[in-house]
Design a protein with these regions (language model features):
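Helix-terminus/linker motif at the lipid-water interface of multi-pass membrane proteins
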Residues: 1, 64-66, 122-124, 183-214, ...
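Interfacial/gating helices of multi-pass transporter permease domains
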Residues: 1-15, 73-74, 167-171, 175, ...
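Short runs within selected transmembrane alpha-helices of multi-pass transporters and secretion channels
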Residues: 8-28, 78-97, 108-120, 132-149, ...
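Helix-loop junctions and terminal segments of transmembrane helices
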Residues: 17-35, 97-98, 208, 212-256, ...
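Alpha-helical transmembrane segments of multi-pass membrane transport and lipid-handling proteins
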Residues: 19, 43-68, 74-77, 118-122, ...
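Helix-loop interface residues and adjacent transmembrane-helix termini in multi-pass membrane transporters
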Residues: 35, 66-69, 99, 127, ...
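Interhelical loop/hinge segments that connect adjacent transmembrane helices in multipass membrane
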Residues: 103, 146-191, 226-243, 360-376, ...
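Membrane-proximal transmembrane or re-entrant/amphipathic helices at the cytosolic face
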Residues: 358-361, 366-368, 375, 387-444
């Protein structure tokens, strides 16, 4: 069942790029975007989502035949409904990002995640199999969309302009193609494994990727949704852009690094608790993706100023070069097995890091050495914490007690060293948390 969902997700994630990547990004990047711009992009997005759904509907039997999984025919057709539903929220997300109304985005995400988790677990316990996972994904999308429409004070107007659309499309198609190339290459390994091996191999590979990405993507979605609009506001002041980028680099690494290294140190314990011992073959892929996640922090942050200053042309040109190299690397790795295919992911991200740093050096005078130095402190603190967590993992305790001690000791070790060394990122995050608690108390 999970192998089937993994295959479905590949095709839907590719289709999602057309909706969530380019057009709404152009609204955030444009300083004086008005109602005409937002309404125009809304209708374009919805029209595109209908076309994409029809393509998925028509090609579903072909995909099912290619992977020899008959259930894919109906599953893809139902799962693809999230495309037109998503089209109703992407412009809303762009609007609240533009207005810096991030609380609304947070509550929409939390609401969808919690309710979809309940529905997914309930359906799984009732024996719905693959449909439980599809139900979870669809519920998440529908609830997110409903909450955004209920809370965001913008609705599309009865207006559309090809003149307004032209400059937005001119910028966004390059961003869209860049993200599409990235998504295709990120899923290239899954395509190959699903075709050359079997759905069980694909399930271990996909599940191993999913666990680290679950933490990373949620953090990235939150912080990047703040960072990109923030840089776009000051995109004509290079000094301000560099200052914001460096601060974001330090904060992101401070948050992501301990989670990634902690997951590596406690991986076996966590996998056994969450998925049972039969899923332990996914561990090598968990470790590989944790390494990739660490490398992705400077690579991802360094990409934001390139987008914000409007250089989507540079993004696309360099992405083509990077992905050609990645495809060649993956084709070679095919001859050495699934593990070799998985290793191409962190190697590709490392290439992204180097290329993005070269571009940033030219655009905002932020070089690779500065990027790595901004991440170094968090890496050292996280490494010390991971050693402590790994040591506890070798003790002869019951699995649940061991996991609890590993998590608590990891948090205490990381925050304790941060406090003793007067880490600036720790102080900043603590101050933000205290302000949030104060506002909550005032509200109550």
């Amino acid at each position: 069942d999970y192998g089937a969902v993994a295959i479905i997700n590949i095709f839907i994630s590719i289709a999602d790029i057309f909706l969530s990547s380019g057009l709404n990004t152009s609204l955030i990047q444009k300083k004086d975007a008005d109602d005409l711009d937002f309404s125009t992009i809304f209708y374009l997005n919805f029209g595109l989502s209908v076309v994409l759904y029809l393509i998925m509907f028509i090609t579903a039997p072909l995909i099912a035949h290619a992977y020899n999984l008959p259930i894919l025919k109906s599953a893809i057709r139902v799962f693809a409904v999230r495309l037109p539903v998503s089209a109703f929220q992407v412009v809303q997300v762009a609007y609240i990002s533009k207005k810096m109304q991030f609380k609304k985005f947070f509550f929409a995400t939390i609401g969808g995640t919690l309710l979809s988790a309940v529905i997914g677990i309930t359906m799984a316990l009732k024996g719905f199999g693959v449909w439980a996972l599809i139900g979870q994904y669809l519920t998440n999308t529908v609830v997110d969309t409903m909450i955004l429409w209920a809370t965001v004070k913008w609705i599309p107007k009865k207006m559309f302009s090809f003149k307004a659309a032209t400059p937005l499309i001119k910028y966004s198609w390059k961003v869209m193609m860049t993200d599409l190339l990235g998504t295709l290459c990120n899923n290239l390994g899954s395509f190959i494994i699903g075709t050359k091996y079997n759905s069980a191999n694909l399930a271990y590979y996909t599940k191993g990727k999913q666990l680290p990405l679950l933490f990373r993507d949620n953090i990235y979605t939150t912080l990047i949704s703040v960072l990109f609009p923030g840089i776009s506001v000051v995109n004509d002041d290079i000094t301000a852009v560099k200052t914001i980028t460096r601060k974001s680099m330090r904060i992101m690494s401070y948050i992501v690094f301990p989670i990634s290294l902690g997951l590596m140190a406690a991986g076996k314990t966590i996998v056994e608790i969450l998925f049972t011992a039969k899923w332990l073959p996914m561990l090598p892929y968990v470790y590989i993706m944790c390494v990739e996640t660490i490398i992705s922090v400077p690579a991802t942050i360094a990409l934001q100023p390139i987008k914000a200053v409007g250089r989507s042309d540079l993004m696309l040109k360099t992405e083509i070069i990077k992905k050609i190299s990645f495809v060649i690397l993956t084709v070679v790795a095919m001859n050495f097995g699934i593990f070799a295919i998985a290793l191409t992911i962190p190697v590709n991200t490392l290439l992204d890091l180097i290329v993005n740093a070269i571009i940033n050096k030219k655009i905002i005078n932020y070089n690779l050495v500065e990027e790595l130095s901004d991440c170094f402190t968090a890496l050292v603190l996280s490494f010390i914490m991971a050693i402590v967590v790994a040591f506890i993992g070798e003790t002869e305790l019951t699995i649940c007690i061991k996991a609890a001690i590993q998590i608590v000791s990891g948090v205490l070790c990381y925050t304790g060293i941060s406090w003793m060394t007067k880490n600036k990122e720790f102080s900043y995050i603590l101050n933000v948390a205290m302000k949030c608690l104060k506002k909550c108390n005032e509200f109550n």
